[in-house]
């Protein structure tokens, strides 16, 4: 597994596999020297991820693929951050959490170069209903002035914990499937790219450093990751101005915590939102607030 990865992925594999971590650089690219040391005949699967919409270096992917021919391991490709940039590269299997991209209460996708067979699965209706309730409460808090912040956050936390412990596979809900069919993917791509370009052009604060400046034509950003020395103070400052940002990820295992790059990212990285809900006026407001941070 990549050393910089969320706890839910580690937990998923830890139950049945011995995990070895390979290192990433500060721009979240795979360190070739590190993965070279890890891949041998004992490896049954290699998990790769493309972070924040930026694809891993093609030469590294080619190297992993060449090693696969020698050692016959499977490649699992996490496209949760990159599915709109590119659906697949070298993976035998791809996985993506669609609810990270779209305003839906549930839904993910598993796809493969191989034919997949699955048992008949049903919806998890109770959980979906609670998440829909939380989404509505969040909207009322953000846009209607309703004092329900603690209420919606409590539901989200409870449902995320339940999802982490879930063993059974459920079908995507009918409401999420319907909402996905209503999405204009081309418009979403254009909006995200436009917002990324505006932030990159207008950000002017030496305390807030973009993780990278990606300019490739096919790149569709997941969010706008930045590094800030006083990340927690910066996040609180943004919240005071109604800008809510995600942080990634607390490191859980001893091996992960011993890697310097991991801890620097965990302590200092934050994602500025730029998804399709927001237009250039929103970006202008956010960048003005960010630039005023002292």
What are these regions (language model features)?
Residues 108, 115-118:
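A charged, well-structured terminal subsegment
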Residues 4, 23-28, 81, 98-102, ...:
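Short, acidic/turn-prone active-site loops that include or flank metal/cofactor-
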Residues 20, 76-78, 95, 211, ...:
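Structural detector of well-ordered beta-strand residues that form the stable sheet scaffold
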Residues 1-72, 76, 82:
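PLP-dependent aminotransferase-like
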